[in-house]
C-alpha cells in the first residue's frame, strides 16, 4: 500500500538532506503553468510505463500531480513494478500552493 506525504513533510525532509525523487506526472503545459520550485523528475502519466527505467526503484519516490488523483494511480503502478518506497504527495500542487508557496497558481 502506498503512503501519503504532505507537502510540508516532503519539503522538511528534503531540506534536512534526505534523498528522495519527486516525480511530477503532470502534462508539460501544467508544469509550465505551475512549476514546483524544487528539483523534480518530470514524466507525464501517459509516458510512465515507457520511461520507468529513468527511476530508481530503491530510492524513495514521491509522486505529485495537480490534486492527487493521477499521482495516486502512478504510485500504485510503481508499487506493482517493484518500487517499495512510494508516496503520493497529498493534495498535489494545489496543496503545495496553499501550504508552501501561494505564488504558485491554482488551476
Please annotate each region the language model reported.
Residues 1-21, 28-60, 69-107:
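Rhodanese-like catalytic fold shared by cysteine-dependent sulfurtransferases
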Residues 64-65:
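Short, surface-exposed ligand- or partner-binding patches at beta-edge/loop junctions that are enriched
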Amino acid at each position: 500500500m502506498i503512503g501519503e506525504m504532505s507537502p510540508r513533510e516532503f519539503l522538511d525532509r528534503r531540506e534536512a538532506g534526505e534523498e528522495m525523487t519527486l516525480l511530477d506526472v503532470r502534462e508539460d503545459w501544467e508544469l509550465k503553468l505551475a512549476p514546483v520550485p524544487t528539483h523534480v523528475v518530470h514524466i507525464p502519466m501517459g509516458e510512465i510505463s515507457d520511461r520507468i527505467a529513468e527511476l530508481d526503484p530503491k530510492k524513495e519516490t514521491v509522486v505529485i500531480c495537480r490534486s492527487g488523483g493521477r499521482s495516486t494511480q502512478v504510485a500504485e503502478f510503481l508499487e506493482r513494478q517493484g518500487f517499495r518506497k512510494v508516496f503520493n504527495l497529498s493534495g498535489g500542487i494545489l496543496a503545495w500552493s496553499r501550504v508552501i508557496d501561494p505564488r504558485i497558481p491554482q488551476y
